[in-house]
Amino acid sequence: LLGEDMDAETIGRSILSFTNCHPYYTQQLAYQTWNNWKQNGYSDTLVETAITELTHVHDMDYERLWSTFNKTDKKVLIGLTMQMGTPSSLPFLQAVGIDSPSTAFSSLKRLGQQGYVIRNEGYELDDPFFRRWIEVKREGR
């Protein structure tokens, strides 16, 4: 149905890996991937292109959201995005410029209550597109 070169299982796994199986974000990414395939045909970068497009679509939303965070929250979000380790660890704190574990924990608690950070095996951003947006902004792309 999707084409000889298309490996639906690989595409599905790529989508689920990026979204961490979150239903809402999985649906968004699957829909955008499908639309891109329908418009442009299959390519090896089908999922990555959809991720880039969805991140770009929400750029202004993420800019506005980012401006609402205090400096500590921004540092924690950057540290989580860049996978700098456990937020209470010395390497994490030094890398992001936070002086104490209690400050980082207060930020994590606040970000968790607001729904931006979740705890699974460790702390992570709930929205994978927001995570990608932070990565892109940090790299200056």
Regions found by a protein language model. Give the residues of each.
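Alpha-helix C-capping/helix-to-loop hinge sites
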Residues: 1-2, 18, 33-36, 83, ...
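Helix-loop-helix "sensor" segment of P-loop NTPases
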Residues: 1-19, 38-41
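Alpha-helix initiation/capping motif
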Residues: 4, 18, 40, 47, ...
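Short, surface-exposed helix-loop/turn micro-motifs enriched in polar/charged residues
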Residues: 6-8, 25, 39, 43, ...
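The conserved phosphate-sensing helix
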Residues: 8, 18-31
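C-terminal leucine-rich, beta-strand-based interaction scaffolds used for sensing/assembly
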Residues: 10, 52-141
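Short acidic/histidine-centered micro-motifs embedded in hydrophobic/aromatic stretches
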Residues: 14, 18, 32, 50, ...
